[in-house]
C-alpha cells in the first residue's frame, strides 16, 4: 500500500521511492545519484567485476527526462535518478552505492486528515516513530484525536510558519504533505524544511509537478494518479501478473510475473532468452528464496520474475514468461 511504501522511503533515508515485490523480499529503491557515489564514472560491468558480492542491479536511469534501461556498458552519472533492484536485506548497501545518506528519523509530521494520512499515521506509529497530525478542520481534528490517541493532533494551517515553528522541527523529523491539495502539500513541506525538518515527502496529483520537486528540496513524492495507474495496469495485464509499479518521471514499468511451466522462458537462461534491449530482469523469487540474477540464471516454472521495461517492450517480454 502507499502508506507502507512511505514507511519504506523514510527508512531508506534519501530514497525518492521504495517499492516492494515478492511479498516484500525484493525491493526497488530509487534516488538521485550523489556526485561522490561509488557507482559513478565506470561502466556497470566493470563495477560488478570489482565487487565480490553483487546483490543488486541498476534497472534504469532517468537523465534529463530520458529513461535509460541499464546494461553492462551503462555509466551512471551524478544527478541521475537511479532505480535499483535488490533483496530486502541489502537495501542499505544499494542506497549507499548511489550515494544516499541514511537519516535517523524519529518523528513524522503528517499534514492532512485524509484516509492516506490516517493509514500513514498508523504505519509510522507501528514503525516506532512519534506522530504529529496537522489539519485545519476542527471536527476532523476531534475525530483524529479519538482515532489516534498516541498521536499529537494539531488543529491549524499546515502551511503556517507559526504552526511549524511551534513544533521545534529538526533533522530527525520527516514532514509529509498528505492533504488533497498539491499546492498545500508542497508549500507545507517547504515551510517545514525551512524550519529545520530533515526530510519532506509530498503527495501530488499533477504529474507536471514532478520535475520541480528535487529543485525545491522535497525529497520524495507519492502520486495519487500513479497509484491508481498501477492498480489499473495490474488489472489490464492480468494473467500471471502479481504486481505492476509505475514511477513519477518515467513511463517504464516494473512488473512481477509468475513463470508458467508451458512458457517459452521456462528452463532457459536469461541470456538465451534474448530479451529486448529495453528490458532488465532485476530479481527472482523461487520457493521462498530471493536473489538478483545474472545472464546464466535459468528460469524455472513458478518463479516470480520482476522485470523493468519500457512500454514498447512490455507485451513481448511478458509473453515469454506466460503460457
Residue spans of the language-model regions?
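Cytosolic regulatory regions of ion transport systems
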Residues: 1-323
